[in-house]
Amino acid sequence: MQLSKAAEMCYEITNSYLHIDQKSQIIASTQEAIRLTRKYLLSEIFVRWSPLNGEISFSYNGGKDCQVLLLLYLSCLWEYFFIKAQNSQFDFEFQSFPMQRLPTVFIDQEETFPTLENFVLETSERYCLSLYESQRQSGASVNMADAFRDFIKIYPETEAIVIGIRHTDPFGEALKPIQRTDSNWPDFMRLQPLLHWDLTNIWSFLLYSNEPICGLYGKGFTSIGGINNSLPNPHLRKDSNNPALHFEWEIIHAFGKDAEGERSSAINTSPISVVDKERFSKYHDNYYPGWYLVDDTLERAGRIKN
């Protein structure tokens, strides 16, 4: 898929979600969250830094938050290009999308689940990402500031980086949508237009998109770090716990299903790697999929504290 086609597809997904008439509280709040993210991107970010010439890069790790933001970013990228093309003296049919791949950085801090690594590579091709992957330091965690510093040295034209962090994430509470990095970091602008989203918004839009989702979420993970500090969320353990699924409508009416005459409850998750299958076979419990969890305060309950 070409980047122009990927961006146009993401625009169609986003536009379709914004026109859902089934106004559950979750969908209505997610529509408002999308509108605010679009405002940040189109009215505040793209007017200061061009998304078409390498001034902006995208931080991507294959997680649910990053993927949601990537879909919205590509959607706005298409709209930005379309508006500029419409305002040109030349007809739209003679306009060509000026980018082949989206500049992207993957900060690979820890030993990662092979399923997630595979998903990052697969979606890099799907969304036409020019992926720079930071190097781990002899098996140890790499310092994030140093990893970004290495990236900036290789891509000095980068002035701003889009980051899919939310207010409920560690150290996210006081962040702003647009802010400069701290003094001990390489100098660039942090673009964080997803801060106001909550967990229900993330699941609702991602499940509706019908895009491939990292298979680890289907195994009960809700927050994915390294293999040594991430487990399925204990609040999704299949014992006496019987959580409700809040996203049945989004799953059944997901983008593209109606057009194909489908009304299935299947969810597009990526394959689990052989290595991870063996690892998960040693778990003594079974878990509901990650999207059964909607409490932001419990999202990181599967992360092991060092």
Swiss-Prot record:
Pathway of action: Cofactor biosynthesis; FAD biosynthesis; FAD from FMN: step 1/1
Keyword presence, Cell inner membrane: no
One Gene Ontology cellular component annotation held by this UniProt entry: cytoplasm
EC number annotated for this UniProt entry: 2.7.7.2
Swiss-Prot/TrEMBL catalytic activity: FMN + ATP + H(+) = FAD + diphosphate
Localization (cell): Cytoplasm
Binding site for FAD: 59, 107, 164, 182-185, 190, 300
Class of this enzyme: transferase
Disulphide-bridged cysteine pairs: none
UniProt keyword Cytoplasm present: yes
Main localization of the protein described in the UniProt heading: cytoplasm
One Pfam match: PAPS_reduct
Protein family (similarity comment): Belongs to the PAPS reductase family. FAD1 subfamily.
Name of protein: Flavin adenine dinucleotide synthase
Taxonomic source organism: Saccharomyces cerevisiae (strain ATCC 204508 / S288c)
Organism phylogeny: Eukaryota, Fungi, Dikarya, Ascomycota, Saccharomycotina
